[in-house]
């Protein structure tokens, strides 16, 4: 059994740990992660799928049958499909986003990687993403996986969260600091 990661706890952590152990035994960690990433992307694109996953109105049987059809059409099979069907049968499908996040954390720890949450005002090009990864790798000594979120409200710059550290170089924060300083001065 893997050592428990403090960032992986609760119901979602237990399910993620069980899936991780199963994938490790089968030597299918990368395949399971790819399938979970695909399912996560499907959730991001489909409000109907989100409703199926989160709504308590659907019975476990209805969720399982609908999920089986969705997974089949998406080409998600094997360990991942069976695991998601178990979540549905156990009425835990609502926690799938947290399970995916916890599974990613376990995979990153297993591979000696670190994950950085990056918020930007506009989508970064590949050159800038590579430069950011290299800069973060030089600080941590680990390979970096970036989870990039676009949030126009930060106006410019970026916000990087890596473990317990956060660096906020957003224009919004700088403008708020200036505004606060002007209020104190005047």
Curated annotation (Swiss-Prot):
One of its GO terms (cellular component) is proton-transporting ATP synthase complex. InterPro entries: ATP_synth_OSCP/delta_N_sf, ATPase_OSCP/d_CS, ATPase_OSCP/dsu. Its main location: membrane. GO terms for molecular function: proton-transporting ATP synthase activity, rotational mechanism. Pfam families: OSCP. It is a peripheral membrane protein. Keywords: ATP synthesis, Cell inner membrane, Cell membrane, CF(1), Hydrogen ion transport, Ion transport, Membrane, Transport. It is found in: Cell inner membrane. The keyword Membrane applies. SUPFAM superfamilies: N-terminal domain of the delta subunit of the F1F0-ATP synthase. Belongs to the ATPase delta chain family. F(1)F(0) ATP synthase produces ATP from ADP in the presence of a proton or sodium gradient. F-type ATPases consist of two structural domains, F(1) containing the extramembraneous catalytic core and F(0) containing the membrane proton channel, linked together by a central stalk and a peripheral stalk. During catalysis, ATP synthesis in the catalytic domain of F(1) is coupled via a rotary mechanism of the central stalk subunits to proton translocation. This protein is part of the stalk that links CF(0) to CF(1). It either transmits conformational changes from CF(0) to CF(1) or is implicated in proton conduction. F-type ATPases have 2 components, F(1) - the catalytic core - and F(0) - the membrane proton channel. F(1) has five subunits: alpha(3), beta(3), gamma(1), delta(1), epsilon(1). F(0) has three main subunits: a(1), b(2) and c(10-14). The alpha and beta chains form an alternating ring which encloses part of the gamma chain. F(1) is attached to F(0) by a central stalk formed by the gamma and epsilon chains, while a peripheral stalk is formed by the delta and b chains. This is ATP synthase subunit delta. It comes from Nitrobacter winogradskyi (strain ATCC 25391 / DSM 10237 / CIP 104748 / NCIMB 11846 / Nb-255).
